[in-house]
């Protein structure tokens, strides 16, 4: 991988120029604040740096580097920010490489073109490579030798251009009337002119545009007119050729000098003769030639599809061939060939640099993902709210269940062994079987008395048996709001065998023990106090008489009505409550 500078107008790359003259520094990807400063300084649109992105040292001031020894590499300070982005233009104006030599060589080439009218001089100039190489004066000055050769070729090119213009003035009707022979002749002339112009360009390019490298690539291959060095560096560094071709017209590739020379020697001309710079004309079978108005491009033309036609060469060309020449007009076919030749190398570089081909597509994907994440987060919030509501409801139900458990007394049947069946009811208490079970007051009971304020209460009644000829009962009252325990009462209900006479024996938490007797008629029991005993410190006024009435109504609910008489008040209704059966 060749390390290149990511600045827009900078052509510096690794291996170019003297060693250690230019150093390359990575973008601070881990420091977001400093990375934003670098991106603002670089000013590149739709571009994101990666670990393969570098900036050369020419974009930093001298105080941006730490002081080190001369043989050590440059080291940026932790706060260094690039601020210089016009060094390329200043360097050229200072006279380092290009323009002064172009002016000098341009003057020399202009002098040689003035002598191109003499055919003898033209031949001498065309043969200057062999003569100059044989002369002893050329050995101490190899650079002058290199410059003399392009000048001679420039003179030959000027002579052939004059001849081509004279041939171009002939009327088009004469060309159309000529036949296949005249067409082949014109094609051979066009190919010869093309070869001559190519040879002239080989000589004129280094003289007019700078020195030629040993590999045959001139400096203008990296700084094409109208596009700038940034396009070539961009195609190598971060831009994909395919996405760039969609934004702007792709550049027509320009082959280096050595590649042109090899192709011109290898490919035959239209008429079978193709003059080269060092070889004579060679015979080859005629083939179809392009029209005279088509531009000269360095890309290979597609051969005619036939049985003996060789396969099309789609090998990826060097990226330097994708640079457009100054006076070339690319046809649609040549553009496709440029895409085929340059896309391979650019795709390889894109895969190495791990860049995406479309930043807009990635942004749209990120937006879609954000919308989906927000939607899922909203659904998750609603689910959490529902779960919290259900949790609160479950908590309330558990609290109510715990309250009911605290209110209820343990059943007497729970004292029996777990594997034992419930006891069989005695036939003596069968007339009172409709009273068995656990009952809860619904609605709450009401209490009144002349000496008391009206009140309401909750009550649980539990009536059961253990196989004996009697019933066990307990009545537990609670405050309806605070569930505070209030009146409590428990005892036994006995029946006289073979009669309907019932005795009710109870003990209350108020310090009273009473015996009530009465009769049962169907599903109704009426009893009245027979004797009442109380503790010595019982609260006054003392209770002197109590009556009760139990009844099972048509809805299957149990009703109880209690009346009471004290030392100060006559017999008056005191309590009334309706029970609903909970368990049998």
From Swiss-Prot:
Principal subcellular localization: cytoplasm
Biased composition (Basic residues): 89-104
Positions contributing to heme b binding: 451, 574
GO molecular function: DNA binding; nitric oxide binding; peroxynitrite isomerase activity; zinc ion binding
Nitrobindin, as annotated region: 422-584
Catalytic activity: peroxynitrite = nitrate
Start and end residues of each stretch annotated as Disordered: 84-330
Family under the similarity heading: In the C-terminal section; belongs to the nitrobindin family.
Role played: Heme-binding protein able to scavenge peroxynitrite and to protect free L-tyrosine against peroxynitrite-mediated nitration, by acting as a peroxynitrite isomerase that converts peroxynitrite to nitrate. Therefore, this protein likely plays a role in peroxynitrite sensing and in the detoxification of reactive nitrogen and oxygen species (RNS and ROS, respectively). Is able to bind nitric oxide (NO) in vitro, but may act as a sensor of peroxynitrite levels in vivo, possibly modulating the transcriptional activity residing in the N-terminal region.
Name of protein: Peroxynitrite isomerase THAP4
Organism whose genome encodes this protein: Bos taurus (Bovine)
Gene expressing this chain: THAP4
């Amino acid at each position: 991988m060749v390390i290149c500078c990511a600045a827009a107008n900078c052509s510096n790359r690794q291996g170019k120029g003297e060693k250690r003259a230019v150093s390359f520094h990575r973008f601070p990807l881990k420091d977001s604040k400093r990375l934003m400063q670098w991106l603002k300084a670089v000013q590149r649109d739709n571009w994101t740096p990666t670990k393969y992105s570098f900036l050369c040292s020419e974009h930093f001031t001298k105080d941006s580097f730490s002081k080190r020894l001369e043989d050590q590499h440059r080291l940026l300070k932790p706060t260094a920010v690039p601020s210089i982005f016009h060094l390329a233009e200043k360097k050229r104006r200072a006279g380092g490489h290009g323009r002064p030599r172009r002016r000098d060589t341009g003057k020399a080439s202009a002098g040689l073109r003035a002598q191109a009218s003499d055919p003898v001089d033209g031949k001498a100039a065309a043969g200057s490579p062999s003569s100059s190489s044989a002369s002893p004066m050329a050995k101490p000055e190899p650079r002058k030798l290199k410059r003399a050769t392009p000048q001679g070729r420039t003179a030959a090119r000027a002579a052939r251009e004059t001849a081509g213009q004279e041939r171009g003035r002939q009327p088009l009707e004469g060309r159309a009337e000529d036949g296949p022979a005249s067409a082949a002749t014109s094609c051979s002339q066009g190919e010869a002119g093309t070869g001559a112009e190519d040879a002239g360009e080989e000589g004129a390019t280094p003289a007019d545009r700078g020195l030629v490298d040993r590999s045959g690539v001139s400096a203008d291959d990296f700084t094409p007119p109208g596009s700038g060095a940034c396009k070539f560096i961009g195609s190598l560094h971060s831009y994909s050729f395919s996405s760039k071709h969609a934004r702007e017209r792709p550049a027509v590739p320009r082959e280096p000098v050595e590649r042109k020379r090899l192709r011109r020697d290898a490919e035959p001309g239209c008429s079978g003769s193709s003059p080269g710079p060092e070889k004579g004309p060679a015979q080859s079978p005629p083939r179809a030639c392009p029209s005279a108005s088509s531009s000269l491009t360095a890309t290979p033309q597609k051969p005619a599809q036939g049985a003996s036609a060789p396969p099309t060469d789609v090998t990826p060309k060097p990226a330097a061939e994708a640079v457009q020449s100054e006076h070339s007009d690319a046809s649609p076919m040549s553009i496709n060939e440029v895409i085929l030749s340059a896309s391979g190398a650019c795709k390889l570089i894109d895969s190495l640099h791990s860049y995406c081909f479309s930043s807009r597509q990635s942004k749209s994907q990120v937006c879609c993902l954000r919308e989906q994440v927000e939607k899922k987060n909203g659904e998750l919030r609603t689910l959490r709210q529902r779960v919290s509501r259900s949790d609160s409801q479950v908590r309330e139900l558990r609290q109510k269940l715990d309250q009911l458990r605290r209110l209820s007394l343990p059943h007497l049947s729970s004292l029996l062994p777990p594997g034992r069946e419930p006891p069989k009811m005695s036939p003596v208490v069968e007339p009172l079987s409709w009273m068995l079970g656990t009952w809860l007051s619904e609605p709450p009971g009401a209490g009144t008395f002349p000496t008391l304020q009206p009140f309401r209460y909750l009550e649980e009644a539990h009536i059961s048996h253990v196989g004996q000829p009697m019933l066990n009962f307990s009545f537990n009252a609670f405050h309806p709001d605070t569930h505070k325990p209030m009146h409590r009462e428990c005892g036994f209900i006995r029946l006289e065998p073979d009669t309907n006479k019932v005795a009710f024996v109870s003990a209350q938490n108020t310090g009273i023990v009473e015996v009530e007797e009465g009769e049962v008629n169907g599903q109704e029991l009426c009893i009245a106090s027979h004797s009442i005993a109380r503790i010595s410190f019982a609260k006054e006024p003392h209770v002197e008489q109590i009556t009760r009435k139990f009844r099972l109504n048509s809805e299957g609910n149990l009703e109880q009505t209690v009346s009471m008489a004290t030392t100060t008040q006559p017999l008056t209704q005191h309590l009334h409550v309706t029970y609903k059966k909970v368990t049998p």
